[in-house]
């Protein structure tokens, strides 16, 4: 399950899982974007389908779990990657914007972990089968970045939630990790990536470039598969060295 899989980054993560043999479901609000994502991502021999869902609705998430269990029989990997960004100056952030950003970036992840988690915990307790939850975080969830106040705040909460769940569900074999992208060209970043900001970011990145969506594939497969079976509660940073640099 790849929530937010209609976007560029999570779409590539979904494709990587499908290429590795997973029966993969991408999830998004927009059916047209879902159809376009399937056209873009489908490859011979890969099973990739779309399910509509708004992560701000608990009822829709509950129904999504039921539909996928009915169609696929089981759920083993959950990727939570739905997200919004905003560059509104701090003193100008309205209640409406704040609530929207938190609803998608923070509460959407929490609700998805709850709704899918009920199934995963029940299965683990009855059969001993584990699972992997990958919550997509952000470099701004580690160190606050300028101009993205609400986004940084919500992503920091996702990092904290994930570590809590790793502690809570680890004994059941349910691994919970944060995949932390650095700067990747994505639709939600267009408003904040001015030419001046791009130059600053590149100058602060040892590999001296933005990431490519393909470069999230390896980290996704590691966290999703038995290759990462002893990894839980981790923040796997894929940022070209951005977080390692000070001056």
PLM regions and their residue ranges:
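Substrate-binding pocket helix/loop in short-chain dehydrogenase/reductase
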Residues: 89-90, 94-102, 189, 201
